[in-house]
Amino acid sequence: MDKNYIDHHWIYDIETYPSIFTFTIVRADGEYLRQYEISTRKSDQQAFAACLRYMIKNKQKMVGFNNIGFDYPVLHEIMQMLIQSKGAPCEIKAKQIYRIAQDQIASFKSGFGKTIKTEDCLIKQIDLFKIHHFDNKAKSTSLKMLEFNMRSNNIEDLPFPVGKNLTHSEMDELLAYNKHDVMETLKFYRESLEAIRFREKLSEQYGIDFTNFNDTKIGKEYFIMRLEESMPGVCYSHTPRGRKINQTKRKFIRIKDCLFDYYDFTLPEFKAVKQWFANQIISETKGVFSDIDESKLGDVSKYAEMIVKRKKFKGTPTQQDIDYFKNEHPLGWVEVEELKALETLLDSNGEPVYEISIDAKGKENKKKVKVPKKSYWGCWKEASTLNVVVDGFRCDFGVGGIHGSLSNKIVEAEEGYLIIDADVSSMYPNIAISNRVYPQHLSEKFCDIYEDVYNQRKSFPKGSAENAVMKLALNGVYGDSNNEFSPFYDPQYTMTITINGQLSLCLFVDYMKQAIPDVEIIQLNTDGCTVKIKEAYKTKYDCVCEKWQKQVKLQLEYADYKAMYIRDVNNYIALYTNGKVKRKGAYQYEGLGWHQNQSALVIPKAAEAQMLCGISIEEFIDNHMKNPDNKWDFLLRTKVPRSSRLVMILDDGTEVPLQNICRYYPSQQGGKLIKFMPALEGKEDQGERALGLETSYKVLPCNNIEDFSFNKIDLSYYYNEARKLLVGVDNIEELLDNTNIRDSEIANEEGEDYATT
């Protein structure tokens, strides 16, 4: 059995304040923990410098979390100061280090940030933040969030605001916090050992330093290496000014030039989609298949689901206003709405119209005529995404692929029926390989190398480093073909692969509709299709698959389901005939990524137990509580940026400050969780903005696990949220408007100020 550490690895972290700098380091086996302080009260500079010299002399490796972006550049500056002193007395102050740290942080605000080249690092760095791709915006994850997902006993946030001059007692607290962070980083290091060893093996095998590459980058670099071996200079040109990336940039793309010639659709819906694609000339790839006006849909408008959009005119529109509107929306129309408010009626000259009456004395009385005010709206239809509806099943098209699904439905393979899921094997790579599609500047040789990597991967056992790197290489090319910083960049390649992938799956559906009576399409996704058929038609299904595979030169892989519990295309449970379970989206509680929110996992577990096993939600949750180790499944977490503050407001209005990253659980006690954000610019007089992160339930903070108690839990929260995940129930409106804590936390992470009060 492998050790839970690698020799010569040391875990470290630094903290910087104007009055104190701390450096904590521990060997990867957990031994030899050391702390060094340079502050207004003491200086461990000599011992600290000796530690760094030991690392350099003995070729040790330092492991951190975002250390390439912060910790090491600060250490590098300190080491440069010591080197430049050439043995002469050189007293380094905490304030100097603090300024270095702030400059390092500022460098990321104004650009890509200042980092030290790998070859210039005096001590080899391993950055867990980089390895796990947490520097990607979609996966951005802090060490504190990892502490939650690692189920750490204590989650500690930075105890003092940045820039504060700390007292001696606060310095002691900072040292304890620094140690805590190092031990949590050590914990995550052990979770990351497989990834680290994988990178070490690849680096040794291929002569490329993969140490801090994320998985996607490993795949891309491996493929670039293979291309350059075969065609030197094809990815990068070397000029007197340095290395220049080779790409194919296009002013526009004629989609008809991207389409393959093997489509023989019979369904008018798919014929219309193919023709729509063929008519498009695009100059960018993002958003080109969304928010499409009815007038621009062509025949697709006969089969698409559209929404009505409205734009209010300012006052009564003139003919010029209407003409301008109709020019933008040729099939649009104007609607007039009468309001409750009244206004004076005007004649054709814009003068008030009067109602004249004669009273009993013969006196004439004039009164302005009042009529209801009117508002005028320009209305038009548009497709939020390119789509067609085939026999009640909606197929959506996009740059990311096709998708469609039944919603809020249980589909079962009753006696005499089959549910079959067919996925295309390595779809995007094989579209390129089989149809000889390649980024123009890489030449057709690209396809030969792509095919060789694909075939080579199959020769290595699953789980091997070789198999893994080749899988990463196969999958990384497509996404990078639309990355303007990549040597794979050719947006026409991107569009050729994705559009033909979608049309190919449409052809699969078309063939099934023609050959298999009463076939029910359950789901359609980027690389596959799930259907329900009568068992008697299995031979017909097999014939369709064989015909389709021959036509499009792709291979299918199959799975058989006993039942599917579908909330929507992204959230469902599939029960295989062998008893295994596939979970997606809100139902997933196993195999979650480190960047994903792992709050209140008892909720999807309880919903699954009721749907698959017939165990009521209440019974499952009550039984789950009987095991003390299950307490983690009841905990949630939230985070707010340093510019905001998090408080718990008690019934009497008392505000209890909480740390910005907070673990908690719904409780009959405690208070409401509220986030206070800074006032908007120009509206400072209105004060802070308050956002209720959860106002339907009280909560109790639980950053220290010792504060948790099953006796204080509000079980109604867990019961209610699990019920919202039940499929095939009557409360579909509530289900689709699922605003539970877990989902709202995810929304809050994606957009900090998504709601205000």
Residue spans for each PLM region:
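C-terminal, non-catalytic extensions of nucleic-acid polymerases
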Residues: 249, 297, 301-304, 313-320, ...
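Short active-site loop/helix that positions an aromatic residue
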Residues: 69-81, 425-439
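Gly/Thr-rich phosphate-binding beta-strand-loop-beta motif of the actin/hexokinase/Hsp70
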Residues: 3-27, 426-428
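Conserved "right-hand" nucleotidyltransferase catalytic core of DNA-directed polymerases
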Residues: 149-157, 164-425, 508-549, 554-555, ...
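Active-site cores of enzymes that catalyze phosphoryl transfer or operate on phosphate-rich substrates
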Residues: 11-22, 454-494
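Conserved DEDDh/DEDDy metal-dependent 3′-5′ exonuclease domain
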Residues: 33-145
